[in-house]
Amino acid sequence: MLKLQGEDEAAQLAPRRARVPVPRPTAPDVSPSSARLGLACLLLLLLLTLPARVDTSWWYIGALGARVICDNIPGLVSRQRQLCQRYPDIMRSVGEGAREWIRECQHQFRHHRWNCTTLDRDHTVFGRAMLRSSREAAFVYAISSAGVVHAITRACSQGELSVCSCDPYTRGRHHDQRGDFDWGGCSDNIHYGVRFAKAFVDAKEKRLKDARALMNLHNNRCGRTAVRRFLKLECKCHGVSGSCTLRTCWRALSDFRRTGDYLRRRYDGAVQVTATQDGANFTAARQGYRHATRTDLVYFDNSPDYCVLDKAAGSLGTAGRVCSKTSKGTDGCEIMCCGRGYDTTRVTRVTQCECKFHWCCAVRCKECRNTVDVHTCKAPKKAEWLDQT
């Protein structure tokens, strides 16, 4: 190896540096309690950095009206946003379906402590109530999925969507208990409604892939199959004097109320489950409990009693709710008010009565005034309320 001229001189002229011993770092004396505290802090940091389950979802589309702007819908995952941008007409139907299933949910639970109340201008629609894996969450996921199927299927058959129309599979000759008939008319395209609802509604759960996602996917499927369950056969007779020698039939959606009633019964018989270790299926929550079938709604957590305002549990309480003084059911004051008692207010209601038809062409009614007692649940005591918030 060649050395540059003067390199040796420079080496000789350079002062020799004394070697200073460097102390080796020693491990700090850490007590077991400090170690546990550090581990807890690390776990907390990991939990904060992991994506949390937030039920801001496509449900908010129902609050946007006819003008659905995909980028302004909070909570959509990328697949849902892609479908929204590609099919804006279908998104309007999804919004109509959202409004319909929320109305149906509120009808089904109008006499219960939890009455499917929505929160204005809240992207989660129900607040924190759906974060708990409860019966109520099971019902909401099922009926929301059913609402999308029903709305899209109806829009297809009514010619409101360019991507679908009548059911293309109902063609040719068929038979039922009354005999042979020809498929005709415009059968509701349930196949397209189910297919799009599955792709759109299930997209978020398929992305998360946790136990709650498995529960939601199961209940979503229950909702879709419920709509298909109540397809009805409508027919028109052809023949001399309506003899019905030839029938033309088509499949039609039933009123959404039938789906709501059915899912309400499924709610009453919902099965409490736990996820299996591999996270691919369910097992009964306790030994001796029956196993869930494909038509059962499933849930993990017991519901709160919904008696008092509890923001953490998503409970709005029953203070001020109207109740029946004489009923022994869930709408009765004893159950609705959770034993807190009720207030009675006398109110006068004005209704139309003694209506008569006058030629031509008007209906004239009188105004009738009725004084009735309205019973409303008392608010809990202040100390009790503070304990729950």
UniProtKB/Swiss-Prot annotation:
Lineage: Eukaryota, Metazoa, Chordata, Craniata, Vertebrata
Principal location listed in the UniProt entry: secreted
Protein's gene: Wnt2b
Quaternary organization: Forms a soluble 1:1 complex with AFM; this prevents oligomerization and is required for prolonged biological activity. The complex with AFM may represent the physiological form in body fluids. Interacts with FZD4 and FZD5.
Region (Disordered) location: 1-33
Key words of the record: Developmental protein, Disulfide bond, Extracellular matrix, Glycoprotein, Lipoprotein, Secreted, Signal, Wnt signaling pathway
Glycosylation sites per record: 115, 281
Protein name: Protein Wnt-2b
Entry keyword annotation includes Ribonucleoprotein: no
Lineage top rank: taxon: Eukaryota
Record's function text: Ligand for members of the frizzled family of seven transmembrane receptors. Functions in the canonical Wnt/beta-catenin signaling pathway. Plays a redundant role in embryonic lung development.
PANTHER family attached to this UniProt entry: PROTEIN WNT-2B (PTHR12027:SF93), WNT RELATED (PTHR12027)
Reported phenotype of the disruption mutant: No visible phenotype at birth. Combined disruption of Wnt2 and Wnt2b leads to lung agenesis.
GO cellular component: extracellular region; intracellular membrane-bounded organelle
Disulfide-linked positions: 105-116, 156-164, 166-186, 235-249, 237-244, 307-338, 323-333, 337-377, 353-368, 355-365, 360-361
Reported modifications of this chain: Palmitoleoylation is required for efficient binding to frizzled receptors. Depalmitoleoylation leads to Wnt signaling pathway inhibition.
Entry GO MF terms: signaling receptor binding
